[in-house]
């Protein structure tokens, strides 16, 4: 008869226990028809904007999610995307599409609309220009880069990570004692933005960082 060491048996029991603890964690596929994007979400269903419940297609099991009932999801009335919250309301995840990133873009994204927006929000317009545009806005303002720069300007020293690419940007910062992660992608096909944003407490950082990476990497458009 084969004998097993106490160390091996302890490891086996702990592994088995862990598998039971995380057995219910699943990702499901959410498809947004309005903006034509797909993302894996940590819930099996969502409430739509007219009071109904929609079941989502299974994507995969995951040990990143403690239980399938940890989150609840709601689709906006205009069908642009989902708001996902944990049962305590400490974690908020947004995934949505939009044709505009800010009011300046809605109003034409010109020097005048930007100046007016900064004055309304009591932001230092001249300092912003000096820091990001060498004191003068270009004639053709890149809306994605502008929004990225404005976020960097607003959150300043609270920014922990930031990067920008050809059709996306990522920024992570601290706001009201919460970690905020935001990724914005421009879809050339739909001529719209796909926005992912998650905010959570530092105590949830260990599992939420991994959850965010999983969700962001699953976005297709």
Protein language model annotation of sequence segments:
Residues 37, 45-48, 190-221:
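Surface-exposed amphipathic alpha-helical segments
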């Amino acid at each position: 008869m084969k004998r097993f060491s106490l160390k091996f048996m302890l490891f086996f029991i702990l592994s088995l226990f862990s598998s039971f603890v995380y057995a219910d964690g699943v990702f499901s596929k959410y498809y947004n028809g309005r903006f034509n994007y797909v993302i894996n979400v940590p819930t099996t269903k969502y409430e739509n904007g007219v009071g109904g419940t929609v079941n989502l297609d299974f994507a995969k099991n995951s040990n990143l999610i403690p239980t399938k009932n940890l989150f609840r999801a709601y689709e906006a009335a205009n069908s642009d995307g989902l708001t996902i919250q944990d049962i305590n309301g400490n974690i908020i995840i947004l995934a949505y599409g939009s044709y505009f990133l800010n009011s300046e873009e809605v109003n034409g994204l010109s020097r005048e609309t930007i100046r007016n927006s900064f004055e309304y929000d009591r932001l230092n317009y001249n300092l912003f220009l000096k820091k990001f545009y060498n004191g003068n806005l270009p004639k053709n303002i890149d809306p994605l880069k502008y929004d990225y720069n404005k976020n960097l300007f607003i959150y300043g020293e609270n920014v922990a990570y930031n990067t920008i690419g050809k059709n996306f940007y990522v920024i992570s910062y601290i706001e009201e004692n919460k970690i905020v992660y935001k990724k914005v992608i421009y879809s050339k096909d739909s001529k719209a933005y796909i926005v992912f944003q998650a905010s959570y407490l530092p105590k949830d950082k260990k599992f939420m960082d991994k959850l965010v990476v999983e969700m962001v990497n699953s976005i297709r458009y």
